[in-house]
Amino acid sequence: MKAEIWTIEQCPYCIKAKQLLDLFKVEYKERQGFHPDWKTVPYVTIDGNPVGGFVELTSFLRNL
């Protein structure tokens, strides 16, 4: 499983999302800025599929 995460500096939920990905041992590539299809950060895709922000990522990983 590989993820991409769009973040900006000093974003607390971006930091939490990266920590969550680390906790679940999900390899990820970090991209700075906003995803063109999403207006908030963080924004996460896993294996090319949209997941959403921190809340959606938490739910996704808990349901693995």
What spans do the regions from the language model cover?
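Thioredoxin-like thiol-disulfide oxidoreductase module
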Residues: 24-40, 45
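Generic alpha-helical hydrophobic packing signal
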Residues: 3, 32, 39-41, 58-64
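Non-catalytic, surface beta->alpha helical segment in thiol-disulfide oxidoreductase systems
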Residues: 46-64
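Local sequence-structure signature of Cys/Sec-based thiol-disulfide redox active-site neighborhoods
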Residues: 1-31
